[in-house]
Amino acid sequence: MADDEVKPIVRIADVDLDGHKKVPYALTGIKGIGIRMAYAICRELGLDEEKKLGELSDEEIERIEEEIKKLSEGESNIPSWMYNRQKDYETGEDMHLVGAELEMTVKQDIDRLKKIRAYRGIRHELGLPVRGQRTKSSFRRGRTVGVKKKQ
């Protein structure tokens, strides 16, 4: 492949990413990696943040994949306060989950809350807001028959 060509699609962590976007913004296409984590990964690996993802060499893409794998194991040099799962419920370790692993873990957490009948679990079961929002006028679904005034 010539140096001036840009790969239109790059596969990292089982996700097809847009090769025309700058590296940090392209990495946000992976579930569990936000813009701040994407910039942290680029700085950790010494990648040019202004480069397009499709312009990176295969070796650089491999390094990104390895760094994401290190994150999920908690072995990266990125500070643990940036991770999306600190003090895991089962293991007590700090880790950063991505992709299907993140979705599965969140679902297990919600199922655990439902099983122990915690307040948050009950709210999830009922399809109501979990974080204390008001429900008198918000989160209404479906049509209800209103009260008719006497004439």
From Swiss-Prot:
Q: Which UniProt keywords apply?
A: Ribonucleoprotein, Ribosomal protein, RNA-binding, rRNA-binding
The keyword Ligase belongs to this UniProt entry's keyword annotation: no
- Gene3D superfamilies in the record, alphabetically? 1.10.8.50, 30s ribosomal protein s13, domain 2 (4.10.910.10)
* Family recorded in the similarity comment: Belongs to the universal ribosomal protein uS13 family.
Quaternary structure and partners: Part of the 30S ribosomal subunit. Forms a loose heterodimer with protein S19. Forms two bridges to the 50S subunit in the 70S ribosome.
Example GO biological process: translation
What job does the chain carry out?
Located at the top of the head of the 30S subunit, it contacts several helices of the 16S rRNA. In the 70S ribosome it contacts the 23S rRNA (bridge B1a) and protein L5 of the 50S subunit (bridge B1b), connecting the 2 subunits; these bridges are implicated in subunit movement.
Name of this chain's protein = Small ribosomal subunit protein uS13
Basic residues compositional bias, start-end: 133-151
Iron in keyword set: no
Q: Where do the record's region annotations for Disordered lie?
A: 131-151
